[in-house]
């Protein structure tokens, strides 16, 4: 269960760690596209006629009511669920199954409970065949980037829900994916921790070069995180909107942003 505040190590400031660690070289973000695609299962079609182009390196947020097909869309982009009709491509080539180039991050942290945070982050590095010393160094660097430098030897149950999600993000990015697919990863967190994770996500992901598709039911989260926001409803992709920038929590009365928020809520029937 998530806790409402982050666990602190005595006498140390967790927040300074990301700035002290040099970022790894960025990857080349991938282009993901759906072409007139029907998504779901033969006995339960979730979305029909989806045309969507996710540009390399962008953050696309996907918002819609519960049961509208958001998770189905994400699993299709991950290669876990083939389209029922139409096509799906990665960089113009057919996408035919799961790949280490596309990392999934879920609401439940999915960390292995018997492994320390560092050992969890080392998993994709071990799959890549890196030597033990290199795995340890890279895992510690990623944990530092997400503010967990003081918690590398902790087991998942000894840290807060927000910290477990930070570790899950570090594990996903340690594998150097070209796309990160996120299924409501902050949905179980309290409001303060959630806002901190959103800020951290933008900061860390912008340094990776990866393409991001982020599913949420929260319109404000979608507008804060996304370069564009895709709207789902009534079994289809209803619209894709550009999000005005700069990204700033302090700006509440920007006319373009206010109009977009109103448009999104109207489109979703809220």
Spans of features found by a protein language model:
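Conserved ABC ATPase "signature" region
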Residues: 126, 133-151, 203
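Catalytic Walker B motif of ABC-type/P-loop ATPase nucleotide-binding domains
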Residues: 180-183
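Conserved ABC transporter NBD signature motif
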Residues: 86-98, 138
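The feature captures the beta-strand-to-loop junction immediately N-terminal to the Walker
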Residues: 63-65
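Short coil-to-helix segment of the ABC ATPase nucleotide-binding domain corresponding to the Q-loop/switch region
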Residues: 115-123
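Conserved signature/switch motifs of ABC ATPase nucleotide-binding domains
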Residues: 154-157, 175
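Hydrophobic anchor residue at the start of the ABC signature
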Residues: 169
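Helix-to-loop junction immediately C-terminal to a conserved catalytic motif
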Residues: 78
């Amino acid at each position: 269960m998530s806790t409402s505040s982050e666990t602190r190590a005595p006498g140390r400031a967790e927040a300074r760690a990301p700035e002290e660690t040099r970022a790894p070289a960025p990857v080349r973000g991938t282009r993901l596209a759906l072409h007139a695609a029907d998504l779901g299962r033969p006995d339960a079609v979730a979305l029909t006629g989806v045309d969507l182009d996710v540009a390399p390196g962008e953050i696309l947020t996907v918002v819609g009511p519960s049961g509208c097909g958001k998770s189905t869309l994400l699993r299709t982009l991950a290669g876990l669920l083939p389209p029922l009709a139409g096509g799906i491509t990665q960089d113009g080539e057919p996408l035919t199954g799961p790949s280490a180039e596309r990392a999934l991050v879920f609401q439940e942290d999915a960390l292995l409970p018997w492994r320390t945070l560092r050992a969890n982050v080392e998993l994709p590095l071990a799959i890549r065949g890196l030597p033990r010393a290199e795995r340890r160094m890279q895992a510690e660097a990623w944990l530092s980037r997400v503010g967990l430098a003081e918690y590398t030897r902790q087991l998942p149950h000894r840290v807060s829900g927000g910290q477990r999600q930070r570790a899950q993000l570090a594990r996903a990015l340690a594998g150097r994916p070209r796309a990160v697919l996120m299924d409501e990863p902050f949905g179980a967190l309290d409001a303060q921790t959630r806002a901190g994770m959103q800020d951290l996500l933008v900061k860390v992901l912008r340094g990776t070069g990866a393409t991001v598709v982020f599913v949420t039911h929260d319109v404000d989260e979608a507008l804060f995180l996304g370069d564009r926001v895709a709207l789902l409803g009534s079994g289809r992709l209803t619209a894709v909107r550009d999000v005005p920038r700069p990204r700033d929590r302090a700006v509440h009365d920007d006319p373009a942003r206010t109009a977009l928020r109103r448009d999104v809520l109207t489109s979703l029937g809220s």
